[in-house]
Amino acid sequence: MDKKKINVAIDGTSSSGKSTMAKALAKSVGYTYIDTGAMYRSVALFCLRHGLITDGKVDVERLLPMLPDINISFKIEDGKQITYLNGENVENEIRGLEVSNNVSLVAAIAEVHHAMVRLQQEMGKNKGVVMDGRDIGTVVLPDAEIKLYVTTSPEIRAKRRFDEMRAKGDTSVTLNDIIANVKMRDHLDTTRKESPLRKADDAVEVDSGKFATAEEQIAWAVDYFHQFMQGK
């Protein structure tokens, strides 16, 4: 008998492997994957391109009237999800260190956060969605049937991001740069006033450092999903 679709909320710290896990889980079970981090990264890129970030501060007064001009969409190309900002493929650019260093500043702006949450809730209203981010289980989809919270040490997470960047041919930053970035983002994400990163009371905590490979982490998530569905 075909089970009714559910929503899966995956939260966690930066570079914890949650997006890779969420993406693969969605593909495995035939659900839609929503990369909320890419949405905030796109807004950060927009701000950088328009000179709205100076000395670690966002010019909110200038940004707010421009928010309606920011159109973010996703397309599947060659089996991969690509992020578009106002019709332009920005998938690679939003993963760079400059955007990484500024995305938490942008996500902390209440008006930006509210606009993104509205869009994300609209995407999840018909179920069958796997969504990952910082506040999916606590704010965006508080009624999600499955909630996971993924994290591990800053050093393990930084090495993972470093290896990803090297694999793409990006040699512009050192491992120490990325460790510093990860720790800074942890601090900003957990202490921000607007919807700080925290584990939902009913979320299952996943230590991604205990998995030898990303494939092991994905296999665990897929198995967990199927066990949950069988128990419904």
Map each language-model feature to its residues.
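ATP-binding Walker
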Residues: 16
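Walker A/P-loop
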Residues: 19
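N-terminal phosphate/diphosphate-binding loop that engages ATP/GTP or pyrophosphate donors
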Residues: 28-95
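ATP-dependent NMP and nucleoside kinases share a basic, alpha-helical "lid"
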Residues: 91-168
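NTP-dependent small-molecule kinase module
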Residues: 85-91, 100, 159-171, 187-232
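P-loop (Walker A) phosphate-binding loop of NTP-binding proteins
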Residues: 13
